[in-house]
Amino acid sequence: MTIPEKPQGVIWTDAQWQSIYATGQDVLVAAAAGSGKTAVLVERIIQKILRDGIDVDRLLVVTFTNLSAREMKHRVDQRIQEASIADPANAHLKNQRIKIHQAQISTLHSFCLKLIQQHYDVLNIDPNFRTSSEAENILLLEQTIDEVIEQHYDILDPAFIELTEQLSSDRSDDQFRMIIKQLYFFSVANPNPTNWLDQLVTPYEEEAQQAQLIQLLTDLSKVFITAAYDALNKAYDLFSMMDSVDKHLAVIEDERRLMGRVLEGGFIDIPYLTGHEFGARLPNVTAKIKEANEMMVDALEDAKLQYKKYKSLIDKVKSDYFSREADDLKADMQQLAPRVKYLARIVKDVMSEFNRKKRSKNILDFSDYEHFALQILTNEDGSPSEIAESYRQHFQEILVDEYQDTNRVQEKILSCIKTGDEHNGNLFMVGDVKQSIYKFRQADPSLFIEKYQRFTIDGDGTGRRIDLSQNFRSRKEVLSTTNYIFKHMMDEQVGEVKYDEAAQLYYGAPYDESDHPVNLKVLVEADQEHSDLTGSEQEAHFIVEQVKDILEHQKVYDMKTGSYRSATYKDIVILERSFGQARNLQQAFKNEDIPFHVNSREGYFEQTEVRLVLSFLRAIDNPLQDIYLVGLMRSVIYQFKEDELAQIRILSPNDDYFYQSIVNYINDEAADAILVDKLKMFLSDIQSYQQYSKDHPVYQLIDKFYNDHYVIQYFSGLIGGRGRRANLYGLFNKAIEFENSSFRGLYQFIRFIDELIERGKDFGEENVVGPNDNVVRMMTIHSSKGLEFPFVIYSGLSKDFNKRDLKQPVILNQQFGLGMDYFDVDKEMAFPSLASVAYRAVAEKELVSEEMRLVYVALTRAKEQLYLIGRVKNDKSLLELEQLSISGEHIAVNERLTSPNPFHLIYSILSKHQSASIPDDLKFEKDIAQVEDSSRPNVNISIIYFEDVSTETILDNNEYRSVNQLETMQNGNEDVKAQIKHQLDYQYPYVNDTKKPSKQSVSELKRQYETEESGTSYERVRQYRIGFSTYERPKFLSEQGKRKANEIGTLMHTVMQHLPFKKERISEVELHQYIDGLIDKHIIEADAKKDIRMDEIMTFINSELYSIIAEAEQVYRELPFVVNQALVDQLPQGDEDVSIIQGMIDLIFVKDGVHYFVDYKTDAFNRRRGMTDEEIGTQLKNKYKIQMKYYQNTLQTILNKEVKGYLYFFKFGTLQL
């Protein structure tokens, strides 16, 4: 179908317009960061409905997350409503408003689940299945692995024995089990897991594939050998400039001849390389050279450095790639084949038994969703089934968001339900391979890359490719600097995609023309003589200084108004690769009293309150675990002192367990009687809880512990009590989650928690910070994807990449399979095999490529300004980075492949055009002035020494002052002693006032007077209300998604706060539009709409009170006030026994010079039989007379005007006071 011509004045760019209307073939939209892909996707769906007349439920829209799906469906629904209002007679649009609720806008997992629920009979499974939690799934999988390994121990096949010798230790099979588990997850990410496992042995058995692996290594080694040859030639050129270095030149000449032979004919002669020695030692330098001028001495050092680089590169190739002869490597592969085949057999056994266990428990996991869906959609020969054909007929288009994060199974599912081939298909894909950062979840970016390379701009003969490159998020300085970095860093060799004109970012946001350069801040660490802080702590303090500087000097631009506002805390985000720096940052921000929140999924199990409960549970499960038993005794619950524990141990120093020592101490006649009683009470508790745990689920045991010892109340009263309380409730809810699994009992729950900890499935502290809270945030790059912030501080750049997996004896790769090191069982020695060397090299390349993509995601989160924070031990290392080798317009491939961290590359790229000391051959071909505007960096590079950071000075001064004070006190200065005594003896003259609140709400005053009228002591009631804490109703007991009455009340007040008042009244349609507007502005949540009582609001809109307000001269909403109680109550002047009153009035309007206030009430009330409306009105007036009297008196006091009031009850109507 032809793309319609774009009219004049539309907001869409040409590429966006094509993305909205291109059809008739598969379409791949490469949408760069901030290019408006979600808006384009929504518009395409809308145009399919409006222009093409397609029903919304005949489109399949696949998103990456459930949140994205909900947001997408809401946007589409909103657009359909707008279109329906504009064309109320359109029957098609009316149908869409109904069908949107059945529309398939969901994650692929949700689609698969629906498919299974509708066609479970094909699978021969019970339709009443449930989805297992991840932790339950892992526990069951590990249980299965244990059982399968035990079965194979009974068989004792020779290959199995060799596997255990290689992959297990004398103490445990943990590594062996971990490899089996990894292989299982890799296999199920393929459409045919069994076939994938069967193919693992092929490279070990077939010489043709072994030859391919040798060629792969040869190609990889060429990068390093070529770089080595370049370094050798540079060394030769530098030595040629000097006198008295003939011997040096002779050595280098010999090396050049050797290298020429290795590279002869453009091929790498591996046998020659491995059969000869390279990197002969250079002669000592003569005194004549050492006494030469400074330039010559520098040249000598550079020459030696280049020769050293040449030698290290050759050594790397020989040690990493070709440490053994090719024939030996092939022989090793043959010997490894039985082990690899047997390992695959074990994994298939695990898969079979794991599936059997899941079926017996009637549970499915997310992998089952995908594979069962495939089973439904395909015949045995892999062709689409009849069901698949029916879906092909039903779905007129399939739209996939975040396509770069799909895997091979998901790709197969999509291919089963799409129609046609690429040149005439109905598959629309949107994504950005530069933001593919989920390889650990088995995402396969090669799917996107293959299509990107295959599809064409005009779509001739294949699919159509569209590049969305215009960025509407960031300032041009952020974009041009990002482009410059990636044009020199990313290509097909490292990064897996070419960063060219099609891939780069183009400026599209309407910012003003002010200059906002990117800031690269390099912190040079202070040594131990100048600071007691570690390097990480120094960086944390430095980041705080940057935040303070932003808050003091930077402003945020409002594109709509064209004006600036001051920066606030919530405008700033700190991005890091992981949460390793979180604790240091928390402390640094706390020291400066700056509100700070870590958006972390880590640290939950390290919180004091959570550790206490876990120690309690572990001690109950097994009191012979000393660390947990003693931890519980020392806790705030039992408060045993160190000297008491010492007394217990002294009497029984040889006991294996502390529990035994406690029992022995109680029975010892010499024991302290008071301590014995305390211990008896403790053991009684332990035994009581043990008995209780046998008959009750874990969550009830936790609940009993909380109630018995007032755990919630205690931790709620500490600093950060809100978060601590949430953490305790969170653990309680995790116990509920566990109880809903197929496991039971305290021991299994502890295993459940241990598995979460081991897998890094920490939950972070329970989140008590909302998206609009004014705090500085820290989050990982992964969690920031899709978000944007005015100020981004990208720190931790100097933290090395995590290459731990590359050191494992087994390397896994989706494309190539399994690379296992060779292990000589007799000699108990391990060697890299041909497969493990090749796959390890491939894995390292893929790892560095994904780390580059993480950098891209981080840089493109910034709207206004970007701060890059690097850290070095000393400034000398910066010179080495400036002199990294280049190849054309890129940092050399070998330099990129071996880069240890992001800073290594970023600093090298950005510093090359600014450093005067870099020789021309180490500079990029294009001078900075020749670079086009869209890629010309605007960056300030600052080298900061931590000794100069003001925070350090402050810390030092505080420390010095504290020491001086201590010394003065210790020296016994009489004046100081007298001053201290005076302060300690001081009697506060207003003790009684401390028992009264200095500030009270109107509601609190209302309760006070009601209590006094009933003859009850208000002080006692107030203390009870403040001190007593009860559980909030847990989410698991609430109806799914149902709000509580107080939450609905708040929601209704929020709607009323923004409700427009029009003389002609607003219609029901306009009311829906107005509420959708509140959702769009994030004033209320999207899912809150269903809880808004539309009929009650429409009743108010049709009321006389609404008309009166609409005709008022002035209207004020949500007016807060603070006033002296003495003025309101008209107390005598000088009466100091008063408080400040604070409150909030819902609405005030002015009519004919009189001020009226309105208070909305969502109260429900009981209409007793026979009561008239007048009687109910009187009852309601009496209920709120005190509160209303305070409102009236307060306003009269403040305004000095006549004030009247209304109460409006949504369930009753208007009452005038």
Swiss-Prot record:
<keyword id="KW-0227">DNA damage</keyword>
<dbReference type="InterPro" id="IPR011604">
    <property type="entry name" value="PDDEXK-like_dom_sf"/>
</dbReference>
<dbReference type="GO" id="GO:0005524">
    <property type="term" value="F:ATP binding"/>
</dbReference>
<dbReference type="InterPro" id="IPR014016">
    <property type="entry name" value="UvrD-like_ATP-bd"/>
</dbReference>
<dbReference type="InterPro" id="IPR014152">
    <property type="entry name" value="AddA"/>
</dbReference>
<keyword id="KW-0347">Helicase</keyword>
<dbReference type="GO" id="GO:0033202">
    <property type="term" value="C:DNA helicase complex"/>
</dbReference>
<dbReference type="InterPro" id="IPR000212">
    <property type="entry name" value="DNA_helicase_UvrD/REP"/>
</dbReference>
<dbReference type="GO" id="GO:0003690">
    <property type="term" value="F:double-stranded DNA binding"/>
</dbReference>
<keyword id="KW-0378">Hydrolase</keyword>
<dbReference type="Pfam" id="PF12705">
    <property type="entry name" value="PDDEXK_1"/>
</dbReference>
<keyword id="KW-0540">Nuclease</keyword>
<keyword id="KW-0067">ATP-binding</keyword>
<keyword id="KW-0234">DNA repair</keyword>
<comment type="function">
    <text>The heterodimer acts as both an ATP-dependent DNA helicase and an ATP-dependent, dual-direction single-stranded exonuclease. Recognizes the chi site generating a DNA molecule suitable for the initiation of homologous recombination. The AddA nuclease domain is required for chi fragment generation; this subunit has the helicase and 3' -&gt; 5' nuclease activities.</text>
</comment>
<protein>
    <recommendedName>
        <fullName>ATP-dependent helicase/nuclease subunit A</fullName>
        <ecNumber>3.1.-.-</ecNumber>
        <ecNumber>5.6.2.4</ecNumber>
    </recommendedName>
</protein>
<feature type="domain" description="UvrD-like helicase C-terminal">
    <location>
        <begin position="476"/>
        <end position="786"/>
    </location>
</feature>
<feature type="binding site">
    <location>
        <begin position="31"/>
        <end position="38"/>
    </location>
    <ligand>
        <name>ATP</name>
    </ligand>
</feature>
<dbReference type="InterPro" id="IPR011335">
    <property type="entry name" value="Restrct_endonuc-II-like"/>
</dbReference>
<dbReference type="Pfam" id="PF00580">
    <property type="entry name" value="UvrD-helicase"/>
</dbReference>
<comment type="similarity">
    <text>Belongs to the helicase family. AddA subfamily.</text>
</comment>
<keyword id="KW-0413">Isomerase</keyword>
<dbReference type="GO" id="GO:0043138">
    <property type="term" value="F:3'-5' DNA helicase activity"/>
</dbReference>
<dbReference type="GO" id="GO:0000724">
    <property type="term" value="P:double-strand break repair via homologous recombination"/>
</dbReference>
<dbReference type="InterPro" id="IPR027417">
    <property type="entry name" value="P-loop_NTPase"/>
</dbReference>
<keyword id="KW-0269">Exonuclease</keyword>
<dbReference type="Pfam" id="PF13361">
    <property type="entry name" value="UvrD_C"/>
</dbReference>
<dbReference type="InterPro" id="IPR038726">
    <property type="entry name" value="PDDEXK_AddAB-type"/>
</dbReference>
<dbReference type="GO" id="GO:0005829">
    <property type="term" value="C:cytosol"/>
</dbReference>
<dbReference type="GO" id="GO:0016887">
    <property type="term" value="F:ATP hydrolysis activity"/>
</dbReference>
<feature type="domain" description="UvrD-like helicase ATP-binding">
    <location>
        <begin position="10"/>
        <end position="475"/>
    </location>
</feature>
<dbReference type="InterPro" id="IPR014017">
    <property type="entry name" value="DNA_helicase_UvrD-like_C"/>
</dbReference>
<comment type="subunit">
    <text>Heterodimer of AddA and AddB/RexB.</text>
</comment>
<keyword id="KW-0547">Nucleotide-binding</keyword>
<dbReference type="GO" id="GO:0008408">
    <property type="term" value="F:3'-5' exonuclease activity"/>
</dbReference>
<keyword id="KW-0238">DNA-binding</keyword>
